[in-house]
Amino acid sequence: MSPQCFICSLLCWKLQTSLQHPETRKRGWIKERILKMASMFRSEEMYLRQLFLQVESAYCCVAELGELGLVQFRDLNANVNNFQRRFVNEVRRCESLERVLRFLESEMGEEILPVISGKYPETPPPREMIDLETVLEKLEGELEEANQNLQALKQNFLELTELKHLLKKTQDFFETETNLPDDFFSEDTSGLLELRSTPAAVAAKLGFIAGVIKRERLVPFERLLWRACRGNIYLKFSEMDTPLEDPITKEEMKKNVFIIFYQGEQLRQKIKKICDGFRATVYPCSESAGERREVAAGVNTRIEDLNTVITQTESHRQGLLKEASANLWAWGIKVRKMKAIYHILNSCNIDVTQQCVIAEIWFPVVDILRIKRALNQGMERSGSTISPILTAIQTKLDPPTFNRTNKFTAGFQAIVDAYGVGNYREINPAPFTIITFPFLFAVMFGDCGHGAVMLGFALWMISNEKSFLAQKSKNEIWNIFFGGRYLILLMSIFSIYTGFIYNDCFSKSFNIFGSSWRVRPMYNNGVWTDEIVHDNGFLQLNPKTRGVYSGNPYPFGIDPIWNIAINKLTFLNSYKMKMSVIIGITHMVFGVVLSLFNHIYFKQTTNIVLQFIPEMIFIISLFGYLVFMIIFKWCRFNVNNVQNAPSILIHFINMFMFSYDDSTNRPLYEHQQEVQTFLVIFALIAIPWMLLIQPFIIRAKHQKAQDKLASSSLSESPTGDIEVEIMDSNHSEKTNQEVDSSGGHGGHDHGEFNFGDICVHQAIHTIEYCLGCISNTASYLRLWALSLAHAQLSEVLWTLLFSQGFKMTGWIGLIGIFVLFTVFAALTIAILLIMEGLSAFLHALRLHWVEFQNKFYSGSGCSFAPFSFKTIIERNEE
């Protein structure tokens, strides 16, 4: 794993150091290709340039840069209020257009969908905003007028419908109830009066009010009427057969028709107020049956006419929305582009003549020709004759970090950036993570069967990625899985690979090449007899017996015979634990080696001598030696001398205690005591080497710089000032390149020097590294623990669940194995694939973030945020 990564890093460093040679400064596609290849392992080299644009061409030039998406603008008006900037009125106009577009979209709802084309429309010229405002304002006005008319018509339709039901129910009431008793109104009424037979003469003297009320308000309405009128009323109500639609909220309403009989003006006023309080609608209703029939006929005619008018109005409204839907998506893109351009122009300065826009931009060096081409295209579109000007400026700002990615590498880069965006031009862990992350995941997850299921899921997402991208799902969990589809692909492939290494597929082993162990020789040599086999539940194959072990290990992976061995767990524990230690220490050493390339690139010779070398000495002397002992023991001892094999753990503990008097634990090799003593002393020397020397060297350099500055200030002269100014102007381009390439790694030298802070910082770094080597090595044992847990869970599901189906016979066995397989598959996906897979993913993430990246990766930079229409539109759509 690590040799290939080491070679790639060495090649990257060689390419980047060779680019500094004058012979490689030639223009052409060869340099561009080499720069892009080198940028895989480091962030892109960035330039900060001052951009001068004519006011007339500024809009078009910024639009072209937005289409390109490779330029980050600095805000030169950070101290200016947003409402006091130059183009604030244009931004407000764009926001007003966005409001209209949102209104149109809300009116369309889910019935009418905007027409979406495959390609984004071009950025409109500034004058097109006026035309767009005219079109949208006209469309908004017509739609609002249509909505108001439709609402008024529906309100009128609702009232007529209520009146129609009221007249019908009232007519039914008067036809069925014609008489009221003489003593209908009495002071001792105890409740709401119920209908009884009464003379028609008394009924004629009564007044009545008819109306409509919502069904849920009827009970409190009835109770209040009884209490307020002291029971001196007669209330009759009936439910409407069909629900009505509220013209404002579009909600369905259920209403009841009521009729209230009363006697006297005072009661009438009370009833009217109660009806108003409960928002009951009261309609005039004639006492004459003939008049009621005439009114009902007129209402029916008006309802028919209203239906026709409502249909025509709704058709007109739908026509307006369909007309808008054809261009709504394109209008939205255009407005967002215009708004983004004016936001960028607000971050620029305007010179005193009001004729020039001044901007400061970051961009990758390799794309400078594309940027110049885009600026020229913007100038031509605007009709300007003055070309944009790019000038170099000096800065102490840290350049942004830009790592170019594609759909395959984006997921791995996201894992790295989640920990922290790298410092400018430091080694990017993402290319190495492409291999190491799926590999460490697979060490914990290794199973051919589970890996194959995961591989199928990844291939399904990749084969349908175009359709999934077009759907633009808003499900966050799905988007996480889909965004990491290539990561899942590699994790599944590596899981299948490690599954073959472990010889594990759903807790079962493959016997592809035939086992290297034989049982028959145990009988042939007289070690086993029928009585021994019958009387012993556990038998052991002795590799010393001739013919039992062939002497040649299984060609690939673990011998399948271990799958049925009782001591399988003991063997796998030892194997996976030692493998985890070897992988972990190799991974950490590789991280320390990568720090060397950072020191070389940034020309930090002091860090190479006082940081990298003692770090390597410490980790190699102690933990590299542990790896050596593991491998040496594997190679040195076999079945013939296994009884003499010492314990590595005891040797490693005795190494730190300088204790070599343990006669029960034999040495691994000759002169082991001398070698281990030397390594421990060498590792102890590395600690003060890291801790003490560098702070004093930094103080000496600072003192030397202060003395040089003091002497230069004493001998300062006007002539000297002029010479320095001329030299600086002649070499401004070179100075800028040096500042750009160095990034922020020298920025701390410009602050106030504090020797105590430097000592504390160095002490923290030394303690963290030394203790971290111990804790990080132990942390890699999670590879062993999770691999063991995954294998045991898989075996439990097979043994206690699915294998029970093979013990059934007949039709019961057929049905049972089908049911058990369904449960087995569901639990395998839920527990072993999702839960265990997520657990292994998080542990692999921890091993990369903490144990690996902290050896060389600072992760305290700022991300490159280019001005890109594509990014702005996609973010808005989310």
Question: What does each model-found stretch correspond to?
Answer:
Residues 4, 16, 20-21:
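Low-complexity, intrinsically disordered or signal/transmembrane-proximal segments
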Residues 5-8, 12:
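Cysteine-centered motifs
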Residues 33-433, 437, 448, 468, ...:
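Long, charged N-terminal accessory/stalk domains
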Residues 38-47, 54-70, 220, 330, ...:
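Conserved, carboxylate-rich catalytic/transport cores that coordinate ions
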